[in-house]
A protein has these predicted regions:
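A charge-rich, low-complexity, intrinsically flexible signal that marks solvent-exposed coils, linkers
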Residues: 1-22, 26, 30
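Preference for short coil/turn "hinge" residues that link or interrupt alpha-helices
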Residues: 4, 12-14, 47-49, 56-59, ...
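Short alpha-helical segments used as structural interaction elements across diverse proteins
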Residues: 12, 34-36, 61-62
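Short, well-ordered coil↔helix boundary/capping segments
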Residues: 18, 39, 62-65
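A short, structured beta-strand/loop element
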Residues: 27-57
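C-terminal structural segments of small proteins and small subunits
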Residues: 59-84
Length: 84
């Protein structure tokens, strides 16, 4: 397992967007997202300051690239920061 701060830095500097799903969940929590509910393989995560849920699901054991991109866009658009 990689620290959320190091993982986030790697995502910002690397074009590779494949990370283990469990690490992605840890990264979401580090930015203040909370797991709201699960339907089938889809998990819905919410943030107290954002009025838009983020739906994620694993692709095998990794997070899906487009969902990582959506997360990074939300962080940038809403000025979210990590709390460790």
């Amino acid at each position: 397992m990689i620290k959320p701060s190091k993982l986030y830095a790697q995502l910002l500097t690397s074009r590779i967007r494949t990370i283990p799903f469990r690490d992605f969940e840890r990264l979401l929590r580090a930015f203040g997202f909370e797991h709201d509910r699960t339907r089938g393989s889809h998990q819905v995560w919410t943030h107290p300051t954002i009025n838009r849920p983020l739906s994620i699901q694993p692709s095998d054991k990794d997070a899906k690239r487009y969902q990582i991109e959506q997360f990074l866009e939300l962080v940038e658009q809403h000025g979210l920061y990590m709390s460790e």
